[in-house]
Amino acid sequence: MNFRQLIFKILYNENNMKKFLLKPKKSLGQNFILSSEITKKIVALAGSLENFNVIEIGPGYGALTREILVHNPKSLLSIEKDRDLVKHHDQLLNEHQGKYRIIEADALHIIEEELIERPVKVIANLPYNISVALFLKWLDSIKFFTSLTLMFQKEVADRITARPNSKDYGPLSVLSQLLCDIKKEFDIEPKEFFPRPKIHSSVITVNPLPTPKFVVNLETLIKLIRAVFAQRRKMLRNSLQNITNHAETVLENAKLSGNERPENLTIEQFCLLANNVECLLCNKMY
């Protein structure tokens, strides 16, 4: 065991955390990583960091932060909402002056482009209570990022990476995979965290595409997938009635029978449907 591993074992030990550190705040979705092997695996998935600025969300006591800094990024910016935890980063700030900074802020309300320069990689153990909202926020400006290596609740990771004809496939799957190449890398058991959550976690890698996989008006697509997945057990000819009075025409032009359910459609088929709805709205079909 080298010195760094020894320090990690002492600092991020469940018993020591219970005795000496602040009680995690459930309201902030705090679950701290206990395993140095896991932090190593997460950071390794992000690839070389030497020429990249890195953003970390919810650094907690700095387990993942320390591993990121070992890989010598151009700079590291951590965003932490908990003021009490920000104070625990004084030593890291002193050790990595000019390279590391931490901001007390709500990650949902920051504008990354104003805080850090490209190229940017995100590496984060996301707070459970904001993970989906934060990921959707990033999808809205996805081209700003080179890559994202993210830990989610397993159920959220399953929704993001789900394929057609599965129970987890939905709006989050369609939108994410339209804009990015996404891969689920590995699952993590509750015992690897303090406090121990009741659910498993998963790490995914997200690589933004230069352009979406298919040409589509994103606003129309989002309205479409929200409408049809809100009634996911209904056939398309019925669920489409919520967004157009010409469902049969839209289905015919998209070469669909209307008997399909939302979970049966590929991303390409959703984009084709959305484009036909858009044409109707613009009166281009007649």
UniProtKB/Swiss-Prot annotation:
The keyword RNA-binding applies. The keyword Cell division does not apply. One of its GO terms (cellular component) is cytoplasm. It is an enzyme of class 2 (transferase). Its EC number is 2.1.1.182. Belongs to the class I-like SAM-binding methyltransferase superfamily. rRNA adenine N(6)-methyltransferase family. RsmA subfamily. This is Ribosomal RNA small subunit methyltransferase A.
